[in-house]
């Protein structure tokens, strides 16, 4: 579909069946479909119950005309070719408490021109209006009657991302959430978001805030295929009170199917942000002009110039203000590499270039106090697991989160931690999307073990360094580190949570 609409039609029979079952419509009801598309939900609603009234909105005039032809003989179906988010009756009191049921697959990330953005900001001042689906969700909750039911399928990003804090609080206080089912976007034929999963939320409008906060949400995950939505036998089910969620920082849906990790996430004694600075790096404003690459075998390097030996800065003390002549220094860009990362990219560090980075409106000469320092490079976008490598006194670009421990003795210990499965599990519980921004990394709980345990971990990391330099196999050492951190986090778990004590795990 065109970017302006950004519609992904619900072509999965299993998803449609699941959503209709959760909606649980009854006869003589008034139902809203706020973004009808080709009418897949309207068809399913009519098959489920014929004695209902459906109001279907569709912005795309061609689709709206097709719907009018399709339901010409159905007097109980009205098609409205309007922008739901700007429809006058909806944004005035006329639209409030109007519908018994609402079902939708709203557009995700549809482009809004700047004039429309300004209008939406005035109407929905507390929402992140660049993301269309969340605005639909907020509006439609206000359109429900008391006791009315809503079922939406959307990306799951609103459950955790900071920009949706207001929306989460609104939902938690004004509705009782019955169920949230989370699954891969690939369940939609022809759709696969790399940045998030999809979530189907079922909720009931409720003005009683106390009842809402005492409500337990059923969160279902672990689906293998669309058919699993119709039977949760093999799925993972977690229950969490809305009151617990609203007490989380930014009211985020921080949860895990592991009850202990849930407690650790909600009541950590120490977070990464307590012991380390987490920052993003530089943006030149014009990377192809100022950055060069080692050779074109490097991923995504096709349009970059290859660095020559006489341009490299060698044996020169790093200078934040740049050098008198054109010299290039190593910069770490994105890409998931564990422990050690070779020099592949180089940034122009002449005084003239540095001045450009500082003054150009597109450039970001940010967090410069951490340039040329030792720390950890964590790619901001990762796929299956979090990774980290040593910065080794290089510069990081904006695709990297730099983690700089305030106590240097923790550098190798944290390097090991960020490459373990439990770190990935904790971060994905805080933010299930592939975006590992600095603000989320700061929230990861960490348990600092005894001195001898840290020494043992550091020794294993040094062995990995030696093996990486000769292309040796270090998988057994990684497994040992994974086991050690499982012991750190799970051994004496009652002490970790209740008494906040640190464990003497490997003390001699």
Language model features with spans:
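Polybasic, glycine- and aromatic-enriched phosphate-binding surface used to engage nucleic acids
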Residues: 263-264, 269-456
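Periplasmic c-type cytochrome electron-transfer domains
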Residues: 232, 236, 420-423, 498-499
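Non-catalytic DNA-recognition/assembly elements of restriction-modification systems
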Residues: 259-287, 304-309, 327, 450-508
């Amino acid at each position: 579909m065109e970017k302006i609409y950004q519609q992904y039609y619900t072509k999965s029979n299993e998803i449609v069946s699941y959503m209709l079952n959760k909606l649980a419509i009854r006869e003589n009801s008034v139902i809203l479909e706020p973004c009808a598309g080709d009418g897949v939900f309207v068809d399913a609603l009519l098959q489920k119950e014929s004695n209902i009234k459906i109001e279907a909105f569709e912005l795309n005039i061609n689709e709206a005309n097709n719907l009018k032809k399709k339901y010409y003989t159905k007097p109980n179906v009205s098609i409205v070719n309007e922008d739901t988010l700007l429809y006058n009756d909806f944004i005035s009191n006329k639209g409030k408490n109007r519908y018994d049921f609402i079902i939708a697959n709203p557009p995700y990330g549809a482009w809004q021109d700047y004039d429309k953005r300004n209008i939406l900001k005035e109407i929905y001042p507390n929402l992140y209006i660049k993301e269309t689906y969340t605005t639909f969700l907020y509006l439609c909750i206000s359109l429900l009657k008391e006791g009315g039911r809503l079922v939406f399928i959307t990306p799951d990003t609103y459950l955790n991302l900071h920009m949706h804090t207001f929306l989460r609080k609104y939902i938690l206080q004004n509705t009782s959430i019955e169920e949230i089912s989370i699954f891969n976007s690939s369940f939609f034929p022809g759709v696969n978001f790399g940045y998030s999963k999809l979530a189907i939320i079922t909720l009931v409008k409720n003005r009683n805030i106390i009842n809402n906060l005492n409500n337990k949400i059923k969160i279902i995950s672990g689906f293998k295929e669309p058919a699993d939505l119709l039977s949760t036998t093999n799925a993972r089910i977690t229950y969490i009170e809305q009151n617990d969620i609203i007490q989380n920082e930014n009211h985020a849906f921080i949860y895990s199917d592991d009850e202990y990790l849930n407690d650790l996430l909600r009541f950590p004694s120490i977070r990464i942000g307590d012991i380390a600075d987490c920052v993003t790096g530089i943006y030149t404003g014009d990377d192809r002009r100022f950055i060069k690459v080692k050779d074109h075998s490097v991923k995504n390097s096709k349009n970059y110039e290859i660095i020559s030996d006489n341009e490299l800065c060698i044996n020169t003390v790093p200078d934040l203000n740049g050098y008198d002549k054109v010299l290039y220094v190593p910069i770490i860009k994105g890409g998931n590499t564990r422990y050690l990362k070779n020099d592949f990219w180089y940034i122009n560090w002449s005084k003239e270039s540095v001045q450009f980075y500082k003054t150009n409106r597109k450039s970001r000469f940010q967090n410069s106090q951490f340039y040329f320092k030792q720390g950890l490079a964590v790619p901001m976008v990762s796929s299956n697991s979090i990774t980290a490598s040593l910065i080794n006194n290089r510069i990081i670009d904006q695709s990297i989160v730099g983690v700089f421990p305030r106590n240097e003795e923790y550098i190798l210990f944290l390097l090991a931690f960020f490459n373990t499965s439990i770190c990935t599990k904790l971060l994905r519980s805080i933010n299930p999307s592939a975006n590992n921004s600095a603000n989320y990394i700061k929230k990861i709980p960490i348990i600092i073990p005894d001195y001898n345990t840290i020494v043992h971990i550091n020794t294993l990391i040094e062995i990995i360094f030696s093996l990486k330099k000769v292309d040796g196999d270090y998988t057994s050492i990684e497994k040992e580190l994974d086991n050690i951190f499982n012991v750190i986090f799970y051994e004496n778990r009652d002490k970790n949570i209740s008494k906040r004590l640190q464990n003497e795990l490997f003390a001699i």
